[in-house]
C-alpha cells in the first residue's frame, strides 16, 4: 500500500516539504528528501520556494513561481524578478547581475541563464560552496560539510 508523502519518507522517493504530497511506497521514521531526489519525476509543480528541494525550486524571485522540473532555463516572469536577479528574458534591464546562473540539478549544467555574461559560466565558474550564508543563493551548494564561497555559477555536484 502506498502512503502519502510526509516528513518520514525514503530520501529517494519523497520531498519533505511538498506543496502537494507525493505518493511513496516506503516510509521511515526520520525526515528525508535529500537533493538526490531532484529528478524530473521528483520535481513536480510547486509554487512556493519551500515546497520542493532547494535544488529544484527557484528562490530568487519576489513572488513564488511554479516549476515542473529541475532548474527551469529562465528565471521568472516580469512581475517576479528582483532587479538583480535576471536578464532581459525576465523583463529586467541590463543592470541585472551577471552571475545569475542555473542551480544544481540532478543532471546539471554550468551554463548561464539569459542575462548572464558569458564569462560567468566558464570553466572556472563552478567552485565548491557549502553554505548558503556565504554566497549568492544561485551559486552556493547547500548540502556539503565544509563551506567554501563562490561568486558565480553553481557546481554540477555537491561534494
Curated annotation (Swiss-Prot):
Segments passing through the bilayer: none
Region (16 X 5 AA repeats of C-C-[RQVSHE]-[SPTN]-[TASPI]): 8-157
Disulfide bonds: none
Stored InterPro entries: KAP
Sequence repeat boundaries on the chain: 8-12, 13-17, 32-36, 37-41, 46-50, 51-55, 56-60, 61-65, 70-74, 75-79, 80-84, 85-89, 129-133, 134-138, 139-143, 153-157
Matching Pfam families: Keratin_B2_2
Signal sequence annotation: none
Molecular-function GO term, any one: identical protein binding
GO cellular component assignments: cytosol; keratin filament
Subunit structure: Interacts with hair keratins.
Function: In the hair cortex, hair keratin intermediate filaments are embedded in an interfilamentous matrix, consisting of hair keratin-associated proteins (KRTAP), which are essential for the formation of a rigid and resistant hair shaft through their extensive disulfide bond cross-linking with abundant cysteine residues of hair keratins. The matrix proteins include the high-sulfur and high-glycine-tyrosine keratins.
Family: Belongs to the KRTAP type 9 family.
Protein name per Swiss-Prot or TrEMBL: Keratin-associated protein 9-3
